[in-house]
Amino acid sequence: MTGPLSIFYFLILIFSIIVHEVAHGIVAEREGDPTARVLGRITLNPLKHIDWFGSIILPAILILSNAGFVVGWAKPVPYNPENLRRGNKSVALVAIAGIIVNLSLALIFGLLLRVLVTQGLATAAIAEIASIIVLVNVVLALFNAIPLAPLDGFRFLSAVLPRRAERTMRFIEQYSIPLLLLFIVFGWRVVAPFAFTVYSALTGIPI
């Protein structure tokens, strides 16, 4: 991926990551914790969210190396679980908020692309940009759903599983970072079938 397309991909990825993080802060605030608001993190200003490795360096390396899929992350939006009104239920809602937003973006632009293509209104540029938005957000949702710390999937499971699962979750957390790095390098074969299936279901365009 080179030229203008890689720039669009990068910008869409950054925007999608930021929206993902803002969603955590908004839900935390609605559940009783204003920490993200107080720290100025409920904003689309990228300077408030960018993690230099996760938001810039890693995505750039993956894009320039034509990796099978591109992921990234921003600085986590902080929240105080002690302020949440409904305990673990609130924690679970905060954890899953980013994934829901990414899937919502994929759904909106996937259906938009489907309509435009069906009606013959999609130019090549519009179709390309909409396709990137859908695929980026599907991949981000799937990536964040992985049950490895510090991803949302791990946080969600930690909140909803019974107390007897704590030892298992601590064991997973202990080895999460090396497993996550291995997944980023070799995990495309696992993600691709799911990502392409969801993409095709939303857009009506087979891959």
Regions found by a protein language model. Give the residues of each.
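Hydrophobic transmembrane alpha-helices and their immediate loop junctions
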Residues: M1-I207
